[in-house]
Amino acid sequence: CFNNRENGLTKVLGVNASPNTIDELLSAEVILCAGFVAKENQVIRLKLKQAAANGAKVILVNPEGYEQDHMSFAYKTISTSNSLAFFKGVAKVLVDMGKGAGVEGYDAFKASVENADVCEEIKAVAELYANAKKAMIVFQQNVVSVEAATLLADIAVLSGHIGKARDGILELKAKNNSQGIIDLGITAGAEAMEGVKALLVFGEDVPADALKELVFLMVCDTHMTETAKMADVVIPGTGFASTYGTYTNTERRLQVVEQAIEEDVVFNNWEVAAELAHVYEIEMPYDDIEDISDEMNEKLPVYRYGEMGEVSGGVLECKDAKLVAVEDAALIAPLKCTDHLTNMIDERLPKAN
């Protein structure tokens, strides 16, 4: 998936998912937001606004020139350089407070932030966050860099604000079913294209440079995208409104999708893959979506015991958490969305003032 990015949380917490859930924000005392773009996350912005109304101190940290709009309810908005300097300073303050001394990797991490600069503002934020009874960190996975996500997880582990209700991290995934893709074991991003000579693309408008080494390209999509124009074969696909099944959203909640539109296509998207497998004498014994769901339930415990509308796994305890030192890097490194329908809808939606 071209919209996949390595998850910095995995290095520290051992999980490739958001440990906490959205409504936990409403009962937190302090919420630290890093690289948060309000206009791209209106639902979360409203939750943050509700949390502030409930008494939470919402702190927004974005690089200079980056969006600070639509967050007037925030307790503090901070403009910093597009680097990890601010959060390395926060980590140093936590270390100096004696936090996290018993955690695996502590000595190497302590050495990595020993020379971090600490100003009064950094010290105040670190102490406010560390001393809260319940504190959350919020960030967008495909907006902050991998190193930034790793450092934010380090900060949560150092402070002890991890693995408990209303005490942890809310990692916002790029799309409505990004977590579902990860649960199926699909974690590779554009780096998986190295050496690939033939490609089947579902719904993504891929940068042309990523396709130049291909000898065969097949596209299944709802529109004649730029990628489809380059393809050797194009098959009409079905959009989200013409499918049914489930999504697993950013907080690991299972959500039912009901078909709203009947599209005049020969194959549904999953049937395209099944028919291609049949050509290569690989049988996929599915008659319908229910058969696929049954196999997922059999092979994936997280879905076997999942209930529709519920969060799979509850709050993740992250018992194997450790500290991981990070090199200097950007705080913000947005990954461009290649989902054609998502981009088309985003272009046509009215923009907030």
Regions found by a protein language model. Name each.
Residues 2-307, 353:
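Non-catalytic alpha/beta scaffold blocks inside enzyme catalytic domains
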Residues 148-153, 292-353:
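Long, low-complexity segments enriched in small/aliphatic residues
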